[in-house]
Design a protein with these regions (language model features):
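A short, solvent-exposed loop/turn motif at the edges and junctions
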Residues: 145-146, 184, 206-224
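Active-site-proximal C-terminal subdomain of hydrolase catalytic domains
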Residues: 31-32, 36-143
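Short, ordered, surface-exposed loop/turn motifs in non-cytosolic proteins
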Residues: 159-160, 169-183
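Short, acidic Ser/Thr/Gly-rich low-complexity loop/linker segments typical of extracellular
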Residues: 185-198
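Short, hydrophobic beta-strand segments
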Residues: 198-206
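Short, glycine-/Ser/Thr-/acidic-enriched flexible segments
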Residues: 2-5, 33-36, 70-73, 144, ...
Length: 224
């Protein structure tokens, strides 16, 4: 491969426009030479084309891209990064892109311990692998679950609000991030407790309405 894309199987920058994946926007993981070389004369490189693909109303491409920015990577090292990264995600619950990629790179410490000198594999691959996109993005490893959000009537006297967060099966969801927003401003934020409950007090003197959002790994964002 190179900055223009993959050669076997063939998938190049010009092919991105033919994608029709719509809202199913994945993370592209490309353990192929130079496919993430965002400073290359090929502009856009494959990674940039994937991230830029589509429009807000007709999306295509992906939400993030992981790959090397150097042309001279080797399969034996790329495969270690690949294997350790997927092991971290599938077997150890490390689903954020940044930590998962770092886990992949750390595999070279174990598999190639002698490659520790300046410019050798451990240093080289720690520099050339990078993420285009949000490194805190969490990857779905299975069909994501969905929230149900139950809200008790808010008390006008003290702004007391109690929210119950469950999943589709009715199970309580602990440690979900709950954000309450009014006119794009966050007016309260916190985590559900072990019983999936979030309790807060709001200053509702100047609030006509508000939105509640819930987020957690392996869930589609909830909104009410």
């Amino acid at each position: 491969g190179d900055a223009n894309g993959w050669h076997y199987p063939e998938f190049h920058v010009d092919d991105v426009n033919d994608l029709n994946n719509g809202w199913l926007t994945p993370v592209f993981m490309s353990y192929v030479c130079n496919s993430n070389d965002f400073a290359n004369n090929v502009d856009p490189c494959l990674a940039e084309a994937i991230i830029r693909g589509g429009t807000p109303t007709v999306p295509k491409g992906g939400v993030a891209f992981i790959g090397p920015s150097d042309l001279h990577t080797s399969t034996k090292y790329n495969n270690v990064i690949n294997a350790y990264m997927y092991d971290a995600m599938l077997n150890h619950g490390i689903v954020e892109l940044g930590p998962a990629m770092q886990a992949g790179q750390s595999g070279l410490l174990k598999e190639f311990p002698a490659q520790s000198g300046p410019g050798e594999a451990q240093e080289f691959y720690s520099h050339v692998y990078n993420i285009l996109g949000d490194p805190s993005l969490q990857v779905y490893l299975d069909t994501p679950n969905e929230f149900t959000i139950d809200v008790q009537n808010i008390s006008k006297s003290d702004g007391f609000l109690e929210i119950q967060i469950n999943d589709q099966q009715g199970n309580m969801v602990p440690y979900a991030v709950v954000s309450i927003m009014s006119n794009s401003d966050i007016i309260s934020k916190g985590l559900t407790d072990e019983q999936g409950k979030f309790v807060t007090s709001l200053d509702i003197s100047s609030v006509e309405n508000f939105d509640i959002y819930a987020n957690k790994s392996a869930f589609i964002q909830g909104h009410k």
